[in-house]
């Protein structure tokens, strides 16, 4: 039975970025400036022994429910689900979800961005839709279903209905997600100011394909020409200085499957350095749009 939210119940904004390594953001000593995340860390808590599964669906199922991914039947990504217990991708209703729990306790709820927890064979318009966000306690869903999407021509769903992205050469999905999240947050403040909200914001730009705006990629021109071996050394030094890792921490040996930077020819170095620039531009743009959403909350 639903309850009214307690007086003074806080609004909640939960953000999950995608494929952002421990050493990527400046918040944890990385080479990519993420001022929004830096600010959150300075005014909140920063964990350095937090566990993820390093896979989309399992990590997301665990965060969404507070339960181990095998309990959620999501031991692997949904596309690789099997019929075995813990791996069939059919997240049980007994797991509950943050959306459902908070909705039952008087919150308005919305999800913006990536959902990689719908079983692969249930993602069409034939349904069923009982594992889509709108069936997990989220009154509003605007985003995409699956592991990735084109950022200029995304496969968007509003609820369970597919919608077309605007035919605009300046359109970008990451900015669009932020726009929709901001609009919803402002609506909550104007239409239901006495009712708390829970917004789950899950951008997917830092997962391939890395379709970052050109102007954001350009910000990192030449920043990674030193190569990945030197980058590892510089990152570890920053992490030690920040206290993210203990003093005296040593780099693990470079995996044999990854060649040394110096063994690459000039064309390969140019390509790989540009790939790093593109990823950096992607993360920086995500951080910028997260900042826009947080600013709307603070308003």
Put a short name on every predicted segment:
Residues 1-299:
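Formylglycine-dependent sulfatase
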């Amino acid at each position: 039975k639903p309850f009214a939210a307690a007086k003074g119940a806080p609004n909640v904004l939960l953000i999950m970025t995608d494929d952002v390594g421990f050493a990527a953001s400046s918040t944890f000593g990385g080479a990519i400036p993420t001022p929004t995340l830096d600010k959150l860390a300075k005014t909140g808590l920063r964990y350095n022994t937090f566990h993820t599964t390093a896979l989309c669906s399992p990590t997301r199922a665990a965060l969404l429910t507070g339960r181990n991914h095998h309990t959620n039947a999501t031991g692997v990504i949904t596309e690789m689900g099997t019929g075995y217990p813990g791996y069939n991708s059919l997240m049980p209703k007994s797991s509950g979800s943050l959306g459902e729990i908070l909705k039952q306790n008087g919150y308005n709820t919305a999800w913006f961005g990536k959902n990689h927890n719908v079983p692969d064979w249930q993602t069409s318009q034939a349904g069923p839709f009982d594992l889509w966000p709108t069936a997990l306690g989220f009154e509003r869903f605007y985003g995409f279903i699956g592991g990735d999407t084109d950022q200029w021509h995304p496969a968007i769903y509003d609820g369970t209905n597919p919608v077309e992205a605007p035919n605009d050469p300046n359109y970008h999905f990451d900015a669009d997600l932020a726009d929709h999240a901001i609009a919803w947050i402002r609506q909550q403040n104007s239409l239901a100011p006495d009712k708390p909200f829970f917004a789950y914001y899950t951008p997917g730009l830092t997962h391939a394909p890395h379709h970052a705006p050109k102007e954001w990629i350009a910000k990192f021109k030449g920043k990674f020409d030193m190569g990945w071996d030197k980058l590892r050394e510089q990152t570890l030094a920053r992490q030690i200085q920040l206290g993210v890792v203990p003093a005296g921490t040593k780099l693990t040996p470079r995996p044999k499957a990854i060649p040394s930077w110096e063994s690459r020819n000039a064309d390969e170095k140019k390509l790989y350095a540009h790939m790093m620039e593109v990823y950096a531009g992607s993360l920086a743009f995500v951080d910028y749009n997260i900042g826009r959403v947080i600013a709307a909350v603070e308003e």
